[in-house]
Amino acid sequence: MCFVVALLSVTISAKAYDYVTFDNDPAQARRYTLANGLTVYMSRNAEKPEIQTMIAVRAGGQNDPLNSTGLAHYLEHLMFKGTHTYGTTDYEKEKPLLKQIDDLYELYGQTTDPEKRAAIYHQIDSVSYLNSKIAVANEFDKLMSMIGATGVNAYTSDDRTCYHEVIPAGELRRWAIIESDRFQNMVIRGFHTELEAVYEEFNMYSTMDRDKVMLAVNNILYPNVPYRQHSIIGTQEHLKNPSIKNIRRFYDNYYRPNNVVICLSGDLDFDKTIAIIDEYFGQWQPNPTIENYETPYQAPLTQHRDTVVYGKESPEVWMGWRMPDITHKDMDAIEVMESVLQNGKCGLLDVDIDQRQRMLSVGAGALAGKDFTTFFMIGAPKEGQSLEEVRKMLLEEIEKLKRGEFSERMLQAINANERRNEMQSLQSNRSRANKFLHSFIYKIPYEDVIGELDRKAAITKEDIMRVANRYFTDSYACVFKQQGEGVNPPKVDKPKITPIDMNREAQSQRVKELSAMSADQLQPQYLHFDRDLSRSTLNNGQELLYVQNKENELFELDFCIEKGTHQDPSLSLATDLLSYLGTATMTTEMFKSDLYQIAAEAGAYASANETHFYIYGLQENFQKTLQLLEEWVLTARPEETVYQEVVADRIKAHEDSKLDQRSCFGNLRSYGTYGKKNFRRMVLTPKQMKKLSGEKVLTRLRELIPGMCRVTYYGPMREGELKQVLNTQSKLVAQGSRDAQIHSERIQPEVVKKSEVYIAPFDANTTYYVGYANWGEVYTPKDEAIIRLYNEYFDGSMGSIVFQEMREARALCYTSAAYYSMAGHKGENNSYITYIITQNDKLKDCMLTFDSICNFMPMSQAAFEQAKSSLLKSIEKRRYVRSSPIGSYLGFRDKGWDHDLFEDIYREVKNLTLEDVQAFQKQHVANRTYRYFFLGNEKEMPMDFLKTRGSVRRLKIKDIFVY
């Protein structure tokens, strides 16, 4: 039930605002609707002095014109370019130039002759350069930095375009001024360089096989739905022939208040907030004739259809069924059915396939949409297994589901776990805002959104069987993803772009006005080691770090041993094996089912330098969960066949990872940074694994337990009671010994003494590149402030030097970075990193630009002041909540700090100047000796140029993967 209330805000406005509240809403949300149709959701959560903001338009890729695919996504990029009042020094002078660019692009799109197109593009480039002298690049982001906003970004999906950030609680008014301006007065500028950045994004995703598979499924299930025939980014043809007029038409139609929702959650005052929203968004004119998306008719499939997709990555089977839209009455049952199939513990796929090691990996899930829902089943074959065998196993599980071969008890457990997840999500402002967004975009009444758990609790076994039999028919799409040479987009040469003027020192009048506006300044709050967490010692010498949860009944408990795969590569094999085992008295299925029944999690993992055992869940089940964890860790006994299957799967997964561009690059980067002895190469070879046994690797894991050094807890239990339980009942704690505690030596990154070039092969349209420099400079606390300020100034936002020079001015990439990397532990070395993903023929330009800006850093007092303000504001709104005091304390301690380092940083940054940043850059960044890493197609790299950078070392993929 919802209630309508009239609100009179006498302190801000004499205007009355009606709002709606909702029964049984844990977020205690309010929904307002302004006179122009703008919907506003709010929820108050005063845990931190910040507000999660989302402004979402009910239009996305499905609304793209047929001749301008990717338009919604491209408009999302252009929304960051400014308005009539910011992003320009004189909009009236800009207008004729922008009009000329509009007209040239229309002509460009209508021209097919290559020489004529090149001539028109040259004109576009020339006029764009002239316009850049009037425009001010990235003023939107500079404004967001000014108010201390973080997480400033946006995304486009099929049915929405969402713009989001987190702002300090005292900056709501300035935020509303900035955002209302761009949603009402957006100006399209910086078009040709941003288009090239989007094309780089297209290149990056075109190497990913899963996008190709998704499109293949859609081609079968939805042949008449245009937006499902291409990615959100659009087709290559349309990206290269854009129409600014079409983009503006889209903006004018959909970016209207009656088609937009504002979602706010955080430390806000309802009355003041709605008055501010109305003041700045209330004049926005609605569109009574919005062109809504109409779902084309899709004839039902009468039988399944198979197709094959080829690509570099490992083989998989993807099966897709067409199901009803997200608002359909069957969706609750379909979503519960999803958990019956797979929930990570005792679903049909978990028990029958994963725990029995019948596939390399398996997954299931519903991708719900406005028009249809696609239910996917995905399987990856083991070595020697055919894709047809994988399909057969997946279909067998569907048949079991349809026959009802699962227990009612599982449905109760699914609901218990969803309620625990709901309790966790309520702690997140982002999760709250996303619920509001979900309600608006899909036109689902919010009371139905918050009533979802109760409805799902009433779902019966018969309901699951009914929807399974209704929708899991023979009318499905099946894509066999085979390894091989796929069809990739044709390569397109880089356009000739004159670097545009960044106009760094210029400021629009709007920026000056907003800079002069006062805002409520937050006071920083620092972590007090003796107040915000408790530090004590258990009877057997382990350190206990404790924070009490006073908000809900959730707990987290972690046992830490300071030894990981750097010291013993078999530890990751042991924890992997453990995940397939039960206990001395319970099968794997029984053990995982018992955990799921009480909505608890238990696990083990080994990182580079630590091994952890952990549990989390509801406090009422704390001791039961602890008992299950310890019985599992201490008594699990593997059958040798289980161990051999784990080994075989690890070998297969290792081989498959060599086919993935991002995975290969991660290994190359680790190899170049640490040498042969690095985390990603700290794996056992097939011969080494086969030489061991399940019993031996578990013994190695258990032999570490006496060396456990630390236990951390966050939860409702009082500290004294917790210590009593751990000291008297915990078998893991009982095995501990002060004398046996382990503190392993960490592997250090290599010092770069001479310039080198490492090249590893990967055939793609893009090259992944890193420049790594390490002079052996040891981390010292006194450098924290200047390093953080340098990084913020140089590459901290979309208004920073790196973003502007690499992307805005030259359109060399979609993503890039350059930063001074501080060591995470006292006594370790700092390093310097440059990073980019770029089209192959732009690589030389990227490196030369990095040389220029890293060696001769552009100086801008205005940019410096914005970076400084942003850094200070980020510290002012920083709060230590829930379990974060524990992690922050450990991070500070690792670095050698005996108090909150941000207290020193805040004090010191206030006194730093641009000249200090320049001096740091000259001493610690300029003229570095680099080790360069490249993953890509060497035939398309500028090898003569790369040879001037250092001796070239060609690596094989097996070199960076051990075997």
What are the language-model segments listed below?
Residues 13-42, 269-309, 315-316, 351, ...:
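Proteolytic maturation boundary segments
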Residues 43, 48-61, 70-72, 88-181, ...:
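M16 family metallopeptidases and their MPP-like homologs
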Residues 181-188, 280-288, 395-406, 631-640, ...:
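A common structural junction motif
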Residues 199-211:
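Carboxylate/His-rich catalytic cores and anion/metal-binding grooves
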